């Protein structure tokens, strides 16, 4: 997981989406057309630390990337920590 996007187990999903857009060489305008919404709304999404699951699913499908994996890893780490 990208440590600059995580803070003591807290996931900032907006930053992770933004980083993936850059890796994929996709623009905010492209994502806005895919999900569909305005560019301004996408910029707001990128600033948000958490998102509604339905919106995250739309983004994951549009970008063909499973953003839920970050949450699954975070839960797995917490369970491992708890069980020792």
Name every feature range the model reports, one short phrase each.
Residues 30-32:
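Short alpha-helical "recognition helix" segments of helix-turn-helix
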Residues 2-8, 71-84:
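Short, charged recognition helix plus adjacent turn
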Residues 23, 34, 62:
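Residues within the alpha-helical elements of helix-turn-helix
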Residues 48-61:
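Short, basic-rich loop-to-helix N-cap that marks the start of a DNA-contacting helix
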Residues 35-51:
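Recognition helix of helix-turn-helix/homeodomain-like DNA-binding domains
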Residues 1-26:
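A short, Lys/Arg-rich alpha-helix, primarily the initiator
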């Amino acid at each position: 997981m990208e440590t600059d996007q995580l803070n003591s187990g807290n996931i900032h999903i907006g930053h992770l989406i933004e980083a993936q857009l850059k890796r994929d060489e996709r623009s905010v305008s492209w994502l806005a057309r895919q999900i569909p919404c305005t560019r301004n709304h996408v910029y707001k999404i990128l600033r948000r630390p958490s998102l509604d699951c339905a919106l995250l699913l739309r983004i994951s499908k549009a970008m063909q990337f499973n953003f839920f994996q970050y949450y699954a890893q975070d839960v797995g780490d917490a369970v491992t920590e708890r069980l020792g």
